[in-house]
Each structure stands twice: as structure tokens, then as C-alpha cells.
Amino acid sequence: MLLSIGMLMLSATQVYTILTVQLFAFLNLLPVEADILAYNFENASQTFDDLPARFGYRLPAEGLKGFLINSKPENACEPIVPPPVRDNSSGTFIVLIRRLDCNFDEKVLNAQRAGYKAAIVHNVDSDDLISMGSNDIEVLKKIDIPSVFIGESSANSLKDEFTYEKGGHIILVPEFSLPLEYYLIPFLIIVGICLILIVIFMITKFVQDRHRARRNRLRKDQLKKLPVHKFKKGDEYDVCAICLDEYEDGDKLRILPCSHAYHCKCVDPWLTKTKKTCPVCKQKVVPSQGDSDSDTDSSQEENEVSEHTPLLRPLASASTQSFGALSESRSHQNMTESSDYEEDDNDTDSSDAENEINEHSVVVQLQPNGERDYNIANTV
């Protein structure tokens, strides 16, 4: 699951980077505004800036080539004179219209009805370019030709050198720059998808890390099952391997299954917040099969009694095996020393064999509460 999300994240990032680079390179190479390429009878060219209208058809990708005709009347607020008829070919004619006196859509519609393939509206007493629009939906539905807007200086130059009567022709170059919504919306969609994938990836990784950390730590109920021993002088352990302080009487020690003991205040945070292993030998504190299985097995072993069961059997809890083994070894040592003493007594003083001899054998066994219980058995 994590691998598939990572691969998906990588592919989405690569696609996002490629599209971003190509998009910005494409936008930097394309012009911001459309142009009018004008050619006179000597084939000398000149370029004029224009601004396409917000209604009507767009210019074809290859541009629109035609002959420029002055509108009659110039404002085109009423039906205008149609273009001349050419004998050799139909030709394409573009009309030049003066601004003011009526709406832009009305001017362009009159040019369309007269038979022109495009309309150029020029400003009056200004070279500012205006974006032509319309509020009449009925008129907009009827307009099928493209139209552009130019400044007054450009219009005067076109009239002087590049009209049909002067032997010139023009080419309306389309606007190649994409509108903002054309590239901004896909860009935002790609960015949004990448952000969503990043959030999903981070959430998945966070959940997996939390689950892994929780699995490697010891729960509070598991910690309570580990035995606690109150230290006394003479015990086997003397120094805490975590804080390096010597044990003192009354210190509470946490005994791990590996027979290592630590201060409760030192080892408990390690087990519950870091790892459920011994800080020294790295042995697991809790078996991987689960506490329930270990508890069941220990209870079954405790209930099973046979002829091979030792008289001083260790406690069933695996966590107290270390102290149980220690107590059993000390008990065996005391019994051996007692028997040796009896043999020497019998060899040196045989006359006292008939007297009663109290033989004391001390059996030391560690009780579940962690304290030694001394039982004295009197044999006669």
C-alpha cells in the first residue's frame, strides 16, 4: 500500500513538473495580443496591434487574409455598401469602421450583412485598444464573423497605404495566447491533486509509524505483570545499569525475564515509551505470541504434578525464575554443608550417636511477594 502510494506520488509529481515547465515556456513564446500584417502593392509589410472582440467567431488558426475596404458610411450604424465584386475570384474583403454613434455589435452585424468576412473598428482621437463587447443576446446570436479593434494611428496608416484601392492587402493574425481560465484551472487541478496525494501519503506514514511504535512498546497492563522486588542488602543485584546508582534498602526493582533488574523509575519509561526489550541484552520482555498464550501455558504447567516434579519447584511466573533459581541454589548449598557436618560429627563422637541430635535444615523459598520465607524443619 505504501509502495503504491509512493509510486503514484512520484508519477504525479513528474507530470506536474513537466506540465508546468511546458506551460510557462508556451506562454512565454506566444504573443499577448493579435496583430494585423499589412502589405502594400510593393509587398512592403507593416504590423499593427489589435484586440479581438468578445463576440463573434474567432479568427482561424492560419489567419484571415483579405482586402481592406473603408466603410460607407464610416460608422456603420446603418446598412453599408457591400464589397466590390471581382471577376477573377470571389476574394475576401475586410471592412474598416469608425467607432462611436452606435454599439459595436450593431456595426459588426451590418458589416456581416453587407458580405464582409471580418470587421476592423478603429478608435477616435486615441490609440488605446478597447475590448469590444455586447449586451444584446439576440444580436450576438446573429454575428458569425470575427472583428478586432485598433487605434486611430493604425487606422490612418491602413487607409493611406494598405487599402484595396491602393493595391494592398492585410492578414488578421489570430490571438494565440490562451485565456486565463484555460490554463489556470488545469494548473490548479494538478496542484490540488498533488496536495491531496501528499496529505494521503503523510497521513498513511503517520498512522504506520504510530502503529509500529505502539507495537514495539509495552502496555500498562503488561508492565503490571512484571514482578517488582524490594531490594535488601545481600541481594545479587547492586547497580542499576540505566542510572548507574547503587541499590539501597527499600528500592523497588523491576525484574525482567532475562534476570536483569533495574529501578522501576528508570526502566518503566523505557518499556512503555521506547521499546519492550531489556536495555542491556535486548531480549523481549513480552513473548511475541501474546500474553494470553503465555499465561495459559504457565497455569497448565503449574497444575501438572508428576513423580519428576522437584520438591522445591520454581514459581510458575517466568518473571521470577531468576530469584527462584538463586534461592534454590542457596538452599542446596546449605543442605550439603549440613550433611557434611553430620558425617564429621558421627566419625569423631560415636558415643553421642544414641542421643537425640537436632538436625536443622533450612529451606529458603522465594514467595510471590518477593520476600524470603525461612522454614525450619526439625528431624530427630
UniProtKB/Swiss-Prot annotation:
Zinc finger (RING-type): 240-282
Membrane topology, Cytoplasmic segments: 204-380
GO MF term set: JUN kinase binding; ubiquitin protein ligase activity; ubiquitin-protein transferase activity; zinc ion binding
EC number from the UniProt entry: 2.3.2.27
Free-text description of this protein's post-translational modifications in UniProt: Autoubiquitinated.
GO biological process: organelle localization; positive regulation of JNK cascade; protein autoubiquitination; ubiquitin-dependent protein catabolic process
Positions glycosylated per UniProt: N88
Any one of the GO CC terms: nucleoplasm
Lumenal side: 35-182
Region (Disordered): 285-380
Amino acid composition bias (Acidic residues), ranges on this chain: 292-304, 339-356
InterPro entries associated with the record: E3_ligase_sorting_rcpt, PA_dom_sf, PA_domain, Znf_RING, Znf_RING/FYVE/PHD, ZNRF4/RNF13/RNF167_PA
Catalytic activity field: S-ubiquitinyl-[E2 ubiquitin-conjugating enzyme]-L-cysteine + [acceptor protein]-L-lysine = [E2 ubiquitin-conjugating enzyme]-L-cysteine + N(6)-ubiquitinyl-[acceptor protein]-L-lysine
First-level EC class: transferase
Residues spanning the membrane: 183-203
Pfam family, any one: PA
Oligomer and partners: Interacts with ERN1.
Domains (record comment): The RING-type zinc finger domain is required for E3 ligase activity and for promoting ER stress-induced JNK activation and apoptosis.
Protein name: E3 ubiquitin-protein ligase RNF13
Protein source organism: Bos taurus (Bovine)
